[in-house]
């Protein structure tokens, strides 16, 4: 762990480093696709599968500059000897099925009633489920097969040279690229057979149209009529002084609500700092919201949640008998506080939380049935699991740091549930952020990515501990061996295979003299061979068994993201969520983070059914991923606010020792629109070895 050095130069550097944002963005490729754009029949062409994990043509990490060179993915696969061996036609629908009717929810009954998007065969039989991957692509699950794709997009010639920087504006639009809704850029096929055998291949997919009248809205448009109808609610001055005075620039005048959180008042912003650069990019040139987005911003979600709900363009002035916000509730003297204060050197807190869940019904609980206050560890309750909070530095790795911390804590929670007793907790090294940063072909490295795709890599490839590939906050070359695909007869090797072991020539010698007493999980996972210990073999990798959006698909939060997220946290441990951070968030110190009337972009991404009911609650613009560990309630200015407890990735010097509280129950800045869960796998890799060892030692 890095030492804390309290010097003037260190503090100046820290102030510049802590506030990076687009380099922690979770919107990375210049694409935007919505659920309604993908509905209909798709033809999937599949290649052969093998035990080797393949990039299917992507670079590591995935790069925009590399992607645009592939203008025809189907042709690209064929030219690289990836012949198609089978074909499948599916129908992506906006109908829903119950999660419990498709997936095993025996140990997670709270998920059984989730409503997820259905996949049909050509005879209109339900064969699986699907989701958009935020707004970049989609994933289809049919039995033991998973098809993940990023949508095709290309520059339209209206802008300068192609770069790897994010080309989306603050409303999720771009003037520089066009997204295709009818074909994909990359497709990865994964098959999970019995006995944990995983096979991998590639696929190409394109929309099928039965008649010419169906061929419409194939591509996104950079300008539409709606963009001409905007409400000018803030100015465009991008001078630094106005950026620092962000409330005056961005939010409605006349906002008399007292602040719900405190800020630092001594932040030193240098012109060439990451803080200045980020604020200029995300907030100094923030565009006005389109009229449809302004309509959507007046309700909890972008889409109406029932047939009677209508869009309300009038801001509540507080002059009615109705509450100003559904999150402002009357003070209740009968609050139940179940926060635990266990010893951080043991699993005591996790065990007490687990025992508390055993006394509650297994079904999904209503909010009033859940504890008023609950946490898996935070500084306000003085029970943080560990002191050091990851500092992502000058790299947009928040999507990795957050998901891997949640994964680590869920490993600990799951071990407690399996062993059901108190024991010393030896998991004192974080999972390797750098492995995902350098080696993922789904995400864009320091330019950002999605926690959903981090989880996918954890399931398919496994993640070693940080000690084996330490975090450098740079896009180091992935140290995995790369070999040609067996079908690559012409030697081009454009489609690369990943072997599940680090190159013996990689720069690991510095770490060969590890004190294993300080990395107990490494000891449990290691084999006798020194070479195997310091090469990332199967036994040294932590696998995910399952992962998904909370609710079963993107935007499928049942019009009550608060409830389903609370249930998931309560049962299984921390989750990851994303939101759009305003400039005020950079200087957060304490309290409940909430900025009234912050112009947050969102869209309804689905058409209503005949009965006016929307199954999807829409797309929210987000730019930061964080961990949610619990929740609580706090009285501020005579009102009781509900909040989430979050863990950031900007080090201990930010916020409350690296943690923060954010408004709960109102989907503030999209916080309740796209959360994720991940489940550890104890049937293979390091998880299997550790569980068996601990069961033996504890006599289970």
Curated annotation (Swiss-Prot):
Binds 1 Cl(-) ion per heavy chain. Chloride binds at residues 450, 452, 549. PROSITE patterns: THIOL_PROTEASE_ASN, THIOL_PROTEASE_HIS. GO terms for biological process: proteolysis involved in protein catabolic process. Its EC number is 3.4.14.1. Glycans are attached at residues 52, 144, 265, 337, 373, 481, 490, 507, 615, 667. The keyword Protease applies. Disulfide bonds join 395-446, 439-478. This is Dipeptidyl aminopeptidase 1.
